[in-house]
């Protein structure tokens, strides 16, 4: 090909001028000229076609190569070398133009050498492209394009020049377009990148797992919005991608073994996923500490923990969530608490392991902050559920522990070993009881490990929960009993003086059935000390008042104590007298509006109405105190007190002596002959020696329900037919008669009005007094008033004078009228 | 008035003679000045009316929906009164002097003539003389305020001098009623029914215009007069002959309106006189007048409560007089009271449920508080005679709600007032209303800065809310304690002779003892200590009496008669202590006023 081009190029310069000269000179040789011209055109066409094809092919190759090289440059450095090769191609385009313009042989020869090199390179590239990139359809398209371009080149040579000129402004335009991209467009571009990458991952995660790194890189952007969007997008992706099992990385031995392709793919996928997930979590934990990203990071952490509690790195998630359980930010706190409640109530996803870890972490958290957390942190425990089966072995353990008291061995290890032995014995007993059936054996074998593990986990959970509760109780006692020297060091936290005490007591009330007998004694002791905190701190200064427990808090302690005893069916012989003493005194210290009346009503119900065994002295003391209480407080409190009082009298028939005034009551009252209203001990108050005189005053209460109730109670002893059990409880009474719920309209409106007018005489007496004085004064004032009116008459006279003389005859006429009037009067008088 | 002027002008153009036209040209110069003055007065009245009407509408629409219905009724009354004003008002015909009227163009009242007429009227009951005298009376009442329209242009009345002027007014006001009754043959103690029967009496036909002219002139005098004692004297005399108004319902409504206005805006004596008139009207006339009196007074009272005044001393008088009026007919007042108290309860329930600022401010407004005060006094005055238990129950619930709406030391005055109301209701009705929890809660009002001794003057603040600065002062805490002791003393005084007094006083004494231990102020300690000692001594006193008793709590009657002899005896120790506390409280009130 090269040789042919050289010969052809040598010929055109000498031939062109003589051909033209011949045409101009000779007309007879037209035929010959036409033939010669045709041959020349044929030669030019062949030359032109090859050049055009080469140029066109070069351009296309450049465009395609540019695109692929851009992509390959990210992956391989070798492609860059090929890019260098492109530079050689550029001067090739320029050469044919110059050859046409220039006529010197030397320049053309030097360019020929370059053309040869370029041609060889182009040939090689064409081969590579055809093999890897181009398809049949693309080849056909190129062929069509080449034909079209060939037709164009048939016209004239200057067309080529024009085409070359058109290419250069396109490049400039592209350069300008790139510069015009602004920040907003880049923002949207990044958004689209995030979306595209996410879609890729969701469509085919195994193939596109590497793009996770790209998304993680976007999180490093400076724009906060983009970072947030990236974090949320990754959250959605991980939710879908993460498998339903926990990924276990292969060991060294497994790596050495030969593996099939499929296994290789899955291992690669899993390891990449874990790496990305780990880095994502690390970023979330870092962002959580920054205020800008705090809420979003916590939201991502909580959502992941809820969605995939079974997956790897769940411990890290749990630690982060528990750390924010008492966050000052309310939104974050609610998120974390609801997440942990979700974990507790849906143990099927994680098999209960997370429950143990979460409770343990919360216990450590409470310990670290010295019990100064938001109450929500511990209310979370209320969502924990324990199996009923846990109680059975515990009870067995309890019975065995009683026998162990003789041995006096209390180390934990020994207890564990002994428990294991006990379990074996229990199993043997079960085997012996059942007829040696094969099916029973199989069932026992299959379920034993799960049951054992579950019990272990739940016992650990219980121990952590109670550890937390007891720590709170101990801390409360410690803060109350502090000495004066330590006042400045201990200040109440941001959540109040004892923020965790109320949820702690509520939790204890709920989990009483799971409580061990060994701990019950301690618990009761703590509750006693807390409930009786006022007596021990009576000598403290005012500054400590904020640290004392309120009446409602102490009532809660009494409530919990009774609930604990109730749930254990009074198995223990614990002395509850102290709690009755506290209730007896707290009734006097109750303050509506500051203390919760609902708790008072509940404590009255549980401690007095539902109590089975009561001492007569104690019952009488409470009856008397409740009656006194009803005299001083509002409708709701009075009604609940009267309901309780009625219940007590119905249960204790002997206490009804309080309704009668017997002179010889000394025998029943016992040792104490007089009632002591200010006594602190109900057994020593001597209530049986007195009478319920409060009822006669309560029967005059303005509220009809209370007066009716008081009358009913006072008549209880005489009319025994009315002794039906009342369906109303103190709690319902308190709720029904509170101001907010109760209607202000009286039910029975009686309009029997008797008019008695007794005050008619009083105001009449006041009538006569001012008259005498007024007559004199009024006369005087009227004279003054008339003087003022005389002034007005003078003004009138002046007006009349000012007008004109015409008034004068009118005046004369008036005088005449006056004179005439006088005359008939004198006649009449005669 | 403008309309009448136009009509008068048209009438004058058509009917006057040439000579009289000249005299008219002279007169307008004088009348124009007075006309301007009248216009100014009217404009002032209109402005006042506009100002008054707006807040009334707001109050009625916002809070008392049912009372808005009464407002419509009130509007009808206004229309009726306006129609009454448009009636022609002219001089009476003098039959005897018809011949003279053509000749005489202007009549001037002289002393001698007046003396003659007075003698004829007083001694002989000569009707023509009475006619002349009433015409002169009318001229005197409207002296300086003549209306522009004159029905009889040929007659012009003028008064000679000041003494004659005074004599005319005093004589007519004093003697008119007696003269009317003597002519008709009625006694002074005649009732409304007899007066209504007068229509059958032939003498009434000739005398009716005279009576009407008298009342119309007197009402005009009451309206226009600016002097205190003139109005007072006029009202006093008007009461005597109020029965005759039965024949003139339009004038009666007008009188009610004027009296209500004077009752609310007048000074003490005028207000009392106006109230006495309203009371007589409600007693003598039928139930419709009673309703209109009650409604008008109620609206005026509430409207007055909205206006903040420096001197609120007159408000108790208004309240007491309104209660007295309501007590005349408890049956009808009961209906009004139940509607109003139901509205109060609804507002309170809204405030308790929502705790909105707007709802709470309505509760704490002067209008709401004074309305409660009104009904508390009404129920207290009538609860023993009539069966007002439903009203009592509802109002007690309302007061408890107001006291518990917002718990805080800034609302000390409101809480003290609520407890006063409850004590008052309990004392008058004999029903037990517990106040101990409300009172003892005030002991918990802790002040920060106990050491400061800022002696700020506790002026009588009529507002419900106290400023924050006062909470830190020592005087505030002293006032808290004194109020607690005073209120408990009143509560215990009522039940100091009841058989259950020892039990009633147990919890308050216990709380006061703890307070006594905690407080550091010696003055307060001394006062509290003495109170505790007195109560405990009374406890022992009742306890000893109680031990000798033989009946049981079942026996309610014997429990009520317990210690009746001691109750009547004023030498009981607690009663004396209670009197001393009350005297101290009154003394402090006097000091505050000074």
Swiss-Prot record, chain A:
Q: Biased composition, Basic and acidic residues: where in the chain?
A: 67-84, 130-140, 391-400, 420-436
Q: Which regions are flagged for Basic residues bias?
A: 141-150, 817-830
Q: Cite the entry's keywords alphabetically.
A: Coiled coil, DNA replication, Nucleus, Ribosome biogenesis
Indicate, by first and last residue, each region the UniProt record lists as having compositional bias (Acidic residues): 118-129, 159-168
> Residue ranges for motif Nuclear localization signal 2?
408-415
Cellular localization per UniProt: Nucleus; Nucleus, Nucleolus; Nucleus, Nucleoplasm
Q: Where is this motif: Nuclear localization signal 1?
A: 138-145
Q: Please verify whether the record's keywords include Nucleus.
A: yes
Q: Tell me the PANTHER family matching this sequence.
A: NUCLEOLAR COMPLEX PROTEIN 3 (PTHR14428), NUCLEOLAR COMPLEX PROTEIN 3 HOMOLOG (PTHR14428:SF5)
Name-wise, this protein is Nucleolar complex-associated protein 3
Q: What is its quaternary makeup?
A: Component of nucleolar complexes. Interacts with RBL and NOC2 in both the nucleolus and nucleoplasm.
Q: What does this protein do?
A: May be required for synthesis of 60S ribosomal subunits and the transport of pre-ribosomes from the nucleoplasm to the cytoplasm. Also required for initiation of DNA replication.
Q: Which GO terms describe its biological process?
A: DNA replication; ribosome biogenesis
Coiled-coil regions, chain positions:
61-81, 111-156, 400-429
Q: What is the lineage of its organism?
A: Eukaryota, Viridiplantae, Streptophyta, Embryophyta, Tracheophyta
**GO cellular component terms, A-Z:** nucleolus; nucleoplasm
Motif Nuclear localization signal 3 location, chain numbering: 806-813
Family stated for the protein in its record:
Belongs to the CBF/MAK21 family.
Q: What is its main location?
A: nucleus
Region of interest (Disordered), residue spans = 1-22, 67-86, 112-169, 391-436, 802-830
From Swiss-Prot, chain B:
Per UniProt, which keywords does this protein have? Nucleus
Motif: Nuclear localization signal 2; annotated at: 35-42
Q: Where is this region: Disordered?
A: 1-21, 35-58
UniProt cross-references to InterPro entries, sorted A to Z: Noc2
Q: Where is the composition biased (Basic residues)?
A: 1-13
Name its GO BP terms in alphabetical order: floral meristem determinacy
* Tissues showing expression: Expressed at low levels in roots, shoots, leaves, stems, inflorescences, flowers and siliques, with highest levels dividing tissues.
* Protein localization: Nucleus; Nucleus, Nucleolus; Nucleus, Nucleoplasm
Knockout consequence? Plants lacking both CRC and RBL exhibit strong floral meristem (FM) indeterminacy with reiterations of extra floral whorls in the center of the flower associated with reduced AGAMOUS and SUPERMAN levels.
Q: What are the Basic and acidic residues biased-composition ranges?
A: 36-58
Tell me yes or no: is Nucleus among this UniProt entry's keywords. yes
UniProt short sequence motif Nuclear localization signal 3, positions renumbered to this chain? 512-519
GO-annotated cellular components: nucleolus; nucleoplasm; nucleus
Query: Predominant location of this chain?
Result: nucleus
What highest taxon heads this organism's lineage?
Answer: Eukaryota
Q: Annotated motif Nuclear localization signal 1: location in the chain?
A: 8-15
What extra comment accompanies this record?
Answer: 'Rebelote' means once again in French.
Free-text function comment from the UniProt entry: Collaboratively with CYP40/SQN and ULT1, influences floral meristem (FM) determinacy in an AGAMOUS and SUPERMAN-dependent manner, thus contributing to the floral developmental homeostasis.
State the oligomer form and interacting partners: Interacts with SWA2, NOC2 and NOC3 in both the nucleolus and nucleoplasm. Binds to ENAP1 and OBE1.
The similarity annotation says:
Belongs to the NOC2 family.
Q: Spell out the protein name for this chain.
A: Protein REBELOTE
């Amino acid at each position: 090909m090269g040789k042919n081009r050289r010969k052809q190029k040598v010929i055109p310069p000498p031939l062109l001028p003589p051909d033209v000269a011949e045409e101009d000179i000779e007309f007879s040789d037209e035929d010959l000229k036409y033939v010669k011209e045709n041959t020349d055109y044929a030669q030019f066409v062949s030359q032109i076609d090859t050049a055009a094809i080469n140029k066109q092919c070069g351009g296309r190759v450049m465009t395609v190569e540019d695109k692929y090289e851009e992509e390959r440059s990210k992956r391989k450095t070798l492609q860059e070398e090929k890019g260098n090769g492109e530079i050689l191609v550029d001067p090739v385009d320029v050469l044919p133009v110059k050859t046409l313009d220039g006529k010197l042989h030397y320049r053309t020869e030097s360019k020929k050498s370059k053309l040869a090199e370029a041609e060889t390179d182009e040939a090689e590239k064409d081969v590579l492209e055809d093999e890897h990139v181009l398809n049949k359809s693309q080849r056909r398209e190129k062929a069509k394009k080449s034909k079209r371009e060939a037709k164009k080149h048939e016209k004239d040579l200057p067309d080529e020049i024009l085409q070359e000129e058109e290419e250069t402004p396109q490049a400039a335009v592209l350069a300008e377009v790139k510069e015009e991209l602004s920040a907003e467009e880049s923002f949207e571009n990044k958004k689209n990148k995030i979306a595209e990458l996410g879609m890729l991952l969701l469509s085919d995660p195994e193939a596109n797992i590497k793009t996770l790194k790209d998304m993680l890189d976007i999180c490093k952007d400076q724009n906060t919005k983009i970072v947030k969007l990236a974090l949320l997008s990754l959250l959605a992706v991980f939710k879908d991608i993460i498998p339903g099992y926990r990924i276990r990385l292969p060991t060294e031995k497994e790596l050495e073994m030969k593996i099939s392709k499929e296994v290789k793919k899955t291992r690669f996928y899993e390891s990449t996923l874990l790496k990305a997930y780990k880095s994502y979590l690390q970023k979330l934990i870092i962002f959580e500490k920054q205020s800008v990203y705090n809420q979003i990071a916590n939201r991502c952490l909580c959502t992941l923990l809820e969605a995939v509690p079974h997956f790897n790195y769940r411990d890290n998630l749990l630690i982060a969530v528990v750390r924010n359980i008492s966050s000052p930010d309310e939104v974050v706190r609610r998120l974390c608490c609801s997440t942990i409640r979700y974990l507790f109530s849906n143990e099927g996803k994680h098999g209960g392991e997370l429950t143990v870890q979460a409770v343990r972490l919360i216990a450590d958290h409470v310990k670290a902050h010295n019990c100064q957390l938001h109450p929500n942190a511990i209310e979370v425990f209320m969502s924990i559920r324990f199996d009923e089966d846990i109680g059975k072995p515990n009870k067995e353990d309890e019975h065995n522990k009683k026998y162990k008291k003789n041995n006096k061995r209390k180390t934990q290890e020994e207890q564990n070993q002994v428990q294991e032995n006990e379990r074996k014995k229990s199993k043997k007993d079960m085997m012996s009881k059942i007829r040696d059936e094969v099916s029973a054996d199989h069932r026992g074998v299959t379920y034993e490990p799960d049951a054992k593990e579950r019990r272990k986990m739940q016992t650990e959970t219980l121990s952590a929960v109670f550890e937390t509760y007891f720590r709170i109780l101990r801390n409360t006692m410690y803060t109350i009993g502090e000495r004066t020297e330590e006042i400045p060091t201990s200040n109440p936290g941001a959540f109040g003086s004892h923020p965790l005490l109320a949820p702690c007591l509520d939790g204890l009330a709920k989990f009483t059935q799971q409580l061990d007998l060994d701990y019950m004694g301690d618990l009761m002791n703590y509750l006693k000390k807390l409930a009786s905190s006022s007596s021990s701190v009576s000598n403290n200064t005012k500054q400590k008042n904020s640290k004392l427990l309120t009446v409602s808090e102490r009532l809660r302690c009494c409530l919990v104590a009774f609930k604990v005893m109730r749930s254990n069916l009074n198995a223990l012989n614990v002395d509850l007298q102290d709690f009755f003493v506290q209730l007896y005194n707290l009734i006097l210290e109750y303050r509506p509006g500051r203390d919760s009346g609902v708790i008072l009503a509940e404590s009255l119900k549980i401690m007095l109405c539902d109590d089975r065994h009561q001492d007569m002295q104690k019952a009488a003391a409470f009856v008397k105190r409740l009656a006194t209480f009803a005299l001083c407080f509002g409708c709701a409190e009075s009604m609940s007190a009267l309901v309780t009082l009625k219940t007590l009298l119905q249960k204790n028939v002997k206490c009804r002596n309080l309704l009668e005034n017997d002179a010889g009551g000394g025998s029943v009252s016992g040792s104490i002959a007089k009632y002591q209203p200010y006594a602190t001990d109900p057994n020593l108050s001597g209530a049986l020696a007195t009478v319920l005189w409060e009822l006669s005053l309560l029967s005059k209460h303005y509220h009809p329900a209370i007066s009716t109730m008081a009358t009913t109670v006072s008549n209880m002893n005489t009319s025994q037919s009315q002794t039906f059990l009342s369906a109303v409880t103190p709690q319902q009474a308190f709720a029904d008669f509170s101001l907010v719920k109760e209607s202000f309209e009286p039910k029975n409106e009686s309009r029997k009005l008797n008019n008695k007018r007794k005050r008619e005489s009083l105001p009449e007496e006041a009538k006569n007094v001012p008259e005498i004085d007024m007559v004199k004064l009024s006369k005087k004032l009227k004279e003054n008033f008339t003087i003022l009116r005389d002034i007005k008459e003078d003004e009138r006279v002046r007006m009349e004078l000012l007008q004109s003389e015409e008034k004068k005859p009118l005046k004369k006429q008036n005088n005449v009228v006056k004179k005439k009037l006088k005359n008939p009067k004198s006649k009449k008088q005669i | 008035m403008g309309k009448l002027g136009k009509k008068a002008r048209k009438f004058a153009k058509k009917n006057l003679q040439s000579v009289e036209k000249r005299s008219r040209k002279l007169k307008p110069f004088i009348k124009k000045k007075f006309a301007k003055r009248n216009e100014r007065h009217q404009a002032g009245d209109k402005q006042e009316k506009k100002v008054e009407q707006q807040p009334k509408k707001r109050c009625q629409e916002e809070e008392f929906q049912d009372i808005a219905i009464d407002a419509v009724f009130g509007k009808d009354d206004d229309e009726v009164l306006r129609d009454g004003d448009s009636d022609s008002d002219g001089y009476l015909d003098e039959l005897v002097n018809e011949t003279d009227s053509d000749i005489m163009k202007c009549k001037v009242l002289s002393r001698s003539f007046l003396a003659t007429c007075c003698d004829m009227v007083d001694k002989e009951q000569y009707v023509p003389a009475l006619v002349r005298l009433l015409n002169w009376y009318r001229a005197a009442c409207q002296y300086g305020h003549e209306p522009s329209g004159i029905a009889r242009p040929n007659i012009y009345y003028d008064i000679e001098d000041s003494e004659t002027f005074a004599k005319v007014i005093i004589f007519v006001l004093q003697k008119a009623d007696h003269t009317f009754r003597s002519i008709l043959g009625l006694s002074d103690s005649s009732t409304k029914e007899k007066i209504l029967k007068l229509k059958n009496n032939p003498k009434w036909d000739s005398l009716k215009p005279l009576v009407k002219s008298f009342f119309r002139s007197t009402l005009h005098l009451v309206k226009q007069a600016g002097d205190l004692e003139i109005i007072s004297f006029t009202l006093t005399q008007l009461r005597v002959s109020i029965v005759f108004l039965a024949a003139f319902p339009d004038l009666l409504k007008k009188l009610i309106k004027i009296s209500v206005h004077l009752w609310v805006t007048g000074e003490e004596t005028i207000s009392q006189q106006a109230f006495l008139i309203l009371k007589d009207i409600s007693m003598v006339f039928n139930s419709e007048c009673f309703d209109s009196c009650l409604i008008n007074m109620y609206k005026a009272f509430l409207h007055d409560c909205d206006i903040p005044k420096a001197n609120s001393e007159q408000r108790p008088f208004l309240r007491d007089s309104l209660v007295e009026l309501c007590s005349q007919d408890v049956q009808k007042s009961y209906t009004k009271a139940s509607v109003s108290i139901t509205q109060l309860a609804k507002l309170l329930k809204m405030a308790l449920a929502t705790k909105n600022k707007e709802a709470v401010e309505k509760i704490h407004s002067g209008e709401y508080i004074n309305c409660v005060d009104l009904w508390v006094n009404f129920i207290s005055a009538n609860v023993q005679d009539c069966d007002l238990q439903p009203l009592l129950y509802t109002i007690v619930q309302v007061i408890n709600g107001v006291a518990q709406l917002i718990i805080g030391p800034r609302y000390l005055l409101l809480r003290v007032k609520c407890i006063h109301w409850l004590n008052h209701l309990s004392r008058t009705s004999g029903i037990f209303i517990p106040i101990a929890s409300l009172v003892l809660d005030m002991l918990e009002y802790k002040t920060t800065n106990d050491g400061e001794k800022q002696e700020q003057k506790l002026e009588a603040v009529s507002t419900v809310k106290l400023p924050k600065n006062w909470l830190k002062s020592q005087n505030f805490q002293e006032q808290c304690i004194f109020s607690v002791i005073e209120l408990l003393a009143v509560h215990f005084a009522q039940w100091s002779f009841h058989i259950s007094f020892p039990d009633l006083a147990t919890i308050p004494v216990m709380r006061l003892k703890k307070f006594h231990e905690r407080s550091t102020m010696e003055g307060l300690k001394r006062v509290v200590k003495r109170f505790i000692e007195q109560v405990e001594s009374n406890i022992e006193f009742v306890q000893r009496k109680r031990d000798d008793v033989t009946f049981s709590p079942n026996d309610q009657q014997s429990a009520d008669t317990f210690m009746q002899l001691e109750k009547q005896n004023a030498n009981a120790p607690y009663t004396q202590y209670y009197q001393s506390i009350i005297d101290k409280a009154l003394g402090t009130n006097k000091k505050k006023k000074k």
